[in-house]
Amino acid sequence: MSDLYTIDPMLAKDAHIDRAHYKTLYHESIEQPEAFWNKVSQRLEWFKAPTKIKNVSYQLEDVHIRWFEDGELNASVNCLDRHLTLRGDKTALLFEPDAPDAPSSRITYRELYERVCQLGNALRHLGIEKGDRVTIYLPMIPDAVVAILACARIGAIHSVVFGGFAANSIADRVNDCGSKLIITADEGLRGGRKIPLKANVDAALKIHGTQSVETVLVVRHTGSTINMHTPRDRWFHDLVDIQATECAPERMNAEDSLFILYTSGSTGKPKGVLHTTGGYLVYTSYTHETVFDLRENDIYWCTADIGWITGHSYIVYGPLANGTTVLLFEGTPHYPTVSRFWEVIDKHHVTLFYTAPTAIRALMREGDTPVKKTSRKSLRLLGSVGEPINPEAWHWYYTIVGNGRCPIVDTWWQTETGGILITPLIGATDLKPGSVTLPFFGIRPALVDTNGQTLDGPAAGNLVLLDSWPGQMRTLYGDHQRFIDTYFRTYPNTYFTGDGCRRDADGYYWITGRVDDVINISGHRIGTAEIESTLVAHPKVAEAAVVGFPHPIKGQGIYAYVTLITGETPSEALHQELLTWVRKEIGAIAIPDHVQWASNLPKTRSGKIMRRILRKIAENAPDQLGDTSTLADPSIVDLLLNERLKH
């Protein structure tokens, strides 16, 4: 297997940005950031063009981040109105339902505009004003996009809660931001199962602290019988269908709040990441066009849920601001068969495909046949997002899914960053499997040691960012001090990402996992991601998760949870084979002290492995597991506890 995939000259010739252009623009973006971002901001339509481009301080006594602060615009106008003249009849949303035999549907930019205006008018009729918070708890259906853009149109701040979260999670988020209104559906559909969304909202609103909610709008999706509580609950369609199809957009200052999105897995009080209007929209639209080398006739599919930042930035705001045709998929990669993703790609002639390593590894586990039953000839670019992709999965994605002809953009970014920060550009960057490669324009990454000393050249350390970019979060909602303490206090005058990272001799960046996913063995620091990648590279291993546990001699030991590919069974011989494999690939220091076979791993509904829970199982501390309600399948925890090895 090659560890370097050089730029395809034909791709570079047609790409938006080639290598020379990247170097020129990157230099300009670092040396003259205000001039650079002023020019980029002109891609949007402003009521009042900004003249004050950047006003940022990372000083602990005065952390503030403001971009385009005297500009005025509206996000929904940029995603809808400005496309009506030339793209009014172009498909904005291609909706593919959960069930493959259910009809898919198309919504044009004009139809989406009219529906957003109708909901905007309905929200105003219900007393929602600029600055009010609206919670959106919907499945992956077109009305979720409508709800987001309708809030943006009237200046309401949306807080989307992932449709897999239960009542307590909804209540926490409603309570924290003081929502006046919730938009939900009778039920969701996912993998052939019904999700009781309205019932979850009802349960949430019985929890103390949710009394700010005055109205619940309910989309009739499955048609099942549900409880409606009058006068609080209203049917969405009854109210929205009668509204006018024109709705005057609110003039928003660039620094007016656009949305709050709560980070998953945080302990205690939820962390409400706040993004504002101008900088976020400039950054998401620019990164979407540039990273995906966007063309007018592309069919773009990001498989994330709208409840996560990837859905906000790269299903809704970035793509629609660019006038893209976006595929919206309600289902799962495994329903009704493991060929579903590839069948949907063929059905809708998808050209750009953006998914998570978790999905790639899960489908790789099923073998090549389900993929090869389909053609996927429409694809021209593949993307990866959400966590580091191990080289083995990268190669499979490239060779099998992309037929060895589609470059992969392995993108690194966070809820807090708003958009992609480190990524290849297909016409400018040679690819290394497992590396997120080089920084995007305006991004100044650096590596520091635990004392905050900058590490030059090839090195491994903590990833920090030395300067701001327009898409950066502005604060944590209602808790600016926590924002400062979380992101700026650890290494003063920098933004601390919380991620460990390695930089190689070519200046390429390799994300090694969260800093708390580093194991210190006898004074040697080793990233769990490196051990995991090595285990997954073994031909019989589908997935692996590695955590540290207290060791009486070494300080920390290595505990590995291993899921085998379909058809393989655990054995002592295979156990020894894996230990030998790790010794050969990394060295004796990385050999796991314990290997536990796991039929599945505990994951959040967004697909992230909950290593916090795996650590507690490894430590034999079941009473310290904490909240497991965000897991897709909490029963896995009991299974792992029961099978836990004694040590």
UniProtKB/Swiss-Prot annotation:
Binding-site residues for CoA, renumbered to this chain: 190-193, 310, 522, 583
Binding annotation for Mg(2+): 536, 538, 541
Posttranslational mods: Acetylated. Deacetylation by the SIR2-homolog deacetylase activates the enzyme.
GO biological process per UniProt: acetyl-CoA biosynthetic process from acetate
Superkingdom, taxonomy of origin: Bacteria
Enzyme Commission number(s) of this protein: 6.2.1.1
Gene3D superfamilies: 3.30.300.30, N-terminal domain of ligase-like
Gene Ontology annotations for the cellular component aspect, listed alphabetically: cytosol
Reactions accelerated catalytically: acetate + ATP + CoA = acetyl-CoA + AMP + diphosphate
GO MF term set: acetate-CoA ligase activity; AMP binding; ATP binding; metal ion binding
Protein's name according to its UniProt entry: Acetyl-coenzyme A synthetase
Species of the source: Xylella fastidiosa (strain Temecula1 / ATCC 700964)
Gene: acsA
